[in-house]
């Protein structure tokens, strides 16, 4: 946590100066007034500036990345974590020369669990919610492509047999991929059935 004392003619001027010196934003600092400004005799002699002590709040993305890197180190994973940002999401991409299958887990379950923990760490303090997406060697895109192909294949089967086809249980995110992939098809419908970890998508011919 970075601390610094900064002075200015007024408290507000000191705050603005602190933001410039620390290269941050007003939302990411807290400050206490150490000394109030004094105008002095005739506004000149004996005047004293305002002095504030500024504390920069830890960046939630940096905090989450440090947590993830420490966790991966404990797992003996020699990998690199890179960050990409867009207006809606922060992407943490894990890459390395070793096999990342263990890190990804069956159907990405281990990766999803790590993503959940990383988001908890990033958002443990009050403030704007930050959504972090965790990926490893482009697994998410490859999995999405596989799910779309599966959805199209099973939709054809449902139409051919004129019977509903049930998919294996999936996470809410993966079920959404299936629903979205087939929503433009006019001759099939999709819906979810089951509870908890057994919840799955059903693809059925429209009646």
UniProtKB/Swiss-Prot annotation:
Annotated InterPro entries: Jag_KH (IPR038008), Jag_N_dom_sf (IPR038247), KH_dom-like_a/b (IPR015946), KhpB (IPR039247), KhpB_N (IPR032782), R3H_dom (IPR001374), R3H_dom_sf (IPR036867), R3H_KhpB (IPR034079)
Subcellular localization, as worded in the UniProt entry: Cytoplasm
MF terms (GO), sorted A to Z: RNA binding
Domain KH: 58-136
Keywords: Cell shape, Cell wall biogenesis/degradation, Chaperone, Cytoplasm, RNA-binding
GO biological process, one term: regulation of cell shape
Pfam families: Jag_N (PF14804), KH_KhpA-B (PF13083), R3H (PF01424)
Source superkingdom: Bacteria
Described purpose of this protein according to its UniProt entry: A probable RNA chaperone. Forms a complex with KhpA which binds to cellular RNA and controls its expression. Plays a role in peptidoglycan (PG) homeostasis and cell length regulation.
Subunit composition and interactions: Forms a complex with KhpA.
Protein known as: RNA-binding protein KhpB
Source organism per UniProt: Halalkalibacterium halodurans (strain ATCC BAA-125 / DSM 18197 / FERM 7344 / JCM 9153 / C-125)
């Amino acid at each position: 946590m970075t601390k610094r004392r900064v002075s200015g003619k007024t408290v507000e001027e000191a705050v603005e100066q602190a933001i410039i010196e620390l290269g941050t934003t007003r939302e990411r600092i807290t400050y206490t007034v150490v000394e109030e400004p004094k105008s002095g005799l005739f506004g000149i002699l004996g005047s004293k500036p305002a002095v504030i002590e500024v504390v920069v709040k830890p960046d939630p993305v940096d905090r989450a990345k440090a947590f993830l890197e420490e966790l991966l180190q404990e797992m003996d994973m020699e990998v690199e974590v890179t960050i990409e940002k867009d207006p809606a999401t922060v992407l943490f991409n894990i890459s390395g020369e070793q096999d990342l299958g263990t890190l990804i887990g069956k159907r990405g379950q281990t990766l999803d669990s790590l993503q959940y923990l990383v988001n908890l760490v990033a958002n443990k303090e009050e403030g704007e919610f930050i959504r972090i997406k965790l990926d490893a060697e482009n697994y998410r895109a490859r999995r999405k492509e596989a799910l779309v192909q599966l959805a199209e294949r099973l939709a054809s089967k449902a139409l051919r047999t004129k019977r509903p086809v049930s998919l294996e249980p999936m996470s809410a995110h993966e079920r959404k991929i299936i629903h979205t992939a087939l929503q433009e098809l006019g001759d099939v419908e999709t819906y979810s059935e089951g509870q908890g970890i057994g919840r799955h998508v059903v693809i059925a011919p429209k009646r």
